[in-house]
Amino acid sequence: MTTKQTVSLFIWLPESKQKTLFISTKNHTQFELNNIIFDVTLSTELPDKEPNAIITKRTHPVGKMADEMRKYEKDHPKVLFLESSAIHDMMSSREEINALLIKNNIPIPNSFSVKSKEEVIQLLQSKQLILPFIVKPENAQGTFNAHQMKIVLEQEGIDDIHFPCLCQHYINHNNKIVKVFCIGNTLKWQTRTSLPNVHRCGIKSVDFNNQHLEDILSWPEGVIDKQDIIENSANRFGSKILEDPILLNLTSEAEMRDLAYKVRCALGVQLCGIDFIKENEQGNPLVVDVNVFPSYGGKVDFDWFVEKVALCYTEVAKI
């Protein structure tokens, strides 16, 4: 009688991440998939016994968890991390993310990493960058400031930019964004309300936090249409889930799968969230954000998650 292979998966997550990710949790579960026995443990601490893989979300680039993670990787080189410190470091840099997306021909709005006001002026003069454009901090995650953003509407607004940063052409997209959540080749998607169409009306720039988009309601008159304010004043901007993007004719399953596969290959990441929009004029998909180990669109079933992670492990480990 042949003994079935057993694979040990260890999910290492802070309690705060567990609460935001899962509907309910289990400290331990075991199941069979593709003739393999998966033994799964969930904990806020690293394991004493070496598992086959550790699934984790590093909450900050520095600090106790980051130090423990790097040390464990060094001491246990055979353990597969989803995702590793190297991936988390890369995904913390908008400059690195965009460079890899551009290198691999992933469609994104025109984007430039800049370190000074003079660089921005040169980009505008050469028409490589045009108004309006969105300003994103270089750091993509782990801090409050990573979500503090600005839309520059007139050239005078350049004076308010904090450097270094990423300047990206602002694309009007009718207040809809498609979010694709990946666990390897397993995809989950949804449409959410997003930033509204903006207009140049003499205002230099406007600020917002992309995790608290209700700030948009206080923007000066003329920047966005009054109807957008009326329609969204009763809802928190960015938190309203709309119909399936396929039903809204925003995209197709084939397009989402193709885009997700290309982004994952470009960045070397398995657990990620991809945000893309469709520009109003041509309707082409443009990737505007990629993040590591996302929320998966709200709380998910623990058993569903670990089964998809196990499937992802078999894909990565080629077993």
Curated annotation (Swiss-Prot):
The reaction(s) catalysed by this protein are:
1D-myo-inositol 3,4,5,6-tetrakisphosphate + ATP = 1D-myo-inositol 1,3,4,5,6-pentakisphosphate + ADP + H(+); 1D-myo-inositol 1,3,4-trisphosphate + ATP = 1D-myo-inositol 1,3,4,5-tetrakisphosphate + ADP + H(+); 1D-myo-inositol 1,3,4-trisphosphate + ATP = 1D-myo-inositol 1,3,4,6-tetrakisphosphate + ADP + H(+)
Provide the protein name: Inositol-tetrakisphosphate 1-kinase
Which protein family is it in? Belongs to the ITPK1 family.
Query: Cofactor note, please?
Result: Binds 2 magnesium ions per subunit.
Keywords tagged on the record? ATP-binding, Isomerase, Kinase, Magnesium, Metal-binding, Nucleotide-binding, Transferase
Could you say which residues bind ATP here? Answer: R94, K136, H147, Q168, H169, Y170, I171, S194, V288, D289, N291
Subunit structure comment from the entry: Monomer.
Q: Which cofactor does it need?
A: Mg(2+)
Provide the function of this protein.
Kinase that can phosphorylate various inositol polyphosphate such as Ins(3,4,5,6)P4 or Ins(1,3,4)P3. Phosphorylates Ins(3,4,5,6)P4 at position 1 to form Ins(1,3,4,5,6)P5. This reaction is thought to have regulatory importance, since Ins(3,4,5,6)P4 is an inhibitor of plasma membrane Ca(2+)-activated Cl(-) channels, while Ins(1,3,4,5,6)P5 is not. Also phosphorylates Ins(1,3,4)P3 on O-5 and O-6 to form Ins(1,3,4,6)P4, an essential molecule in the hexakisphosphate (InsP6) pathway.
The organism's lineage is: Eukaryota, Amoebozoa, Evosea, Archamoebae, Mastigamoebida
Record-annotated residues binding 1D-myo-inositol 1,3,4-trisphosphate? K17, Q141, G142, H147, N291, S295
Record keyword Nucleotide-binding present: yes
Q: Which residues bind Mg(2+) 1?
A: D275, D289
Name the species this protein comes from.
Answer: Entamoeba histolytica (strain ATCC 30459 / HM-1:IMSS / ABRM)
Q: State the source organism's domain of life.
A: Eukaryota
Which residues hold ADP? R94, K136, H147, Q168, H169, Y170, I171, S194, N210, V288, D289
- Known EC number(s)? 2.7.1.134, 2.7.1.159
- The UniProt record lists the ATP-grasp domain at 98-317
Cysteine pairs forming cystine bridges in this chain are none
Summarize where Mg(2+) 2 binds, as residue positions. Answer: D289, N291
GO BP, one example? inositol trisphosphate metabolic process
**What PROSITE patterns does its record include?**
ATP_GRASP (PS50975)
Q: Where does 1D-myo-inositol 1,3,4,6-tetrakisphosphate bind?
A: K17, K57, Q141, G142, H147, K179, D289, N291, S295
